[in-house]
Amino acid sequence: RPKSEFNEPMDAVVYGTLISLGFATFENYEYVYVYFDNVPPIEIAIVRALTAIPLHASCGIIMGCFLGMHVFRNSDFAIFKALLYPIFFHAAYNYLVGESLFLFLIFFGFTLIYTVFLYTKIRISQENKQKEEEQKLN
């Protein structure tokens, strides 16, 4: 049941993004200061700032979009997508970042495009609401 702090799908997107960026902060700290002794921390920080932070934000947006669909459309399958899609994107990022620059760039571009698509879908549904109190997606 929706609460006053979570009464529309965009709330799920905002909360998902904030949570994912909090996780990214912790993960980036670990990578920069703990894991790599042989690479200068500034190099790791720059690469992670340009790739990992947008990836985590994208995963949070994807998770939030599907969570919003689950809550406000009563879509049972969306809750699984809210978990599986970010897991897939993060796992693919982890694998491709060290495997192939070309494949990584294609994957990274696809991730960003897919994120913009989902975000736009939620924004359009928000704009199509008849009144502010309406909670369901159209």
Regions from the PLM with identified roles:
Residues R1-N138:
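Hydrophobic alpha-helical segments at protein termini of multi-pass membrane proteins
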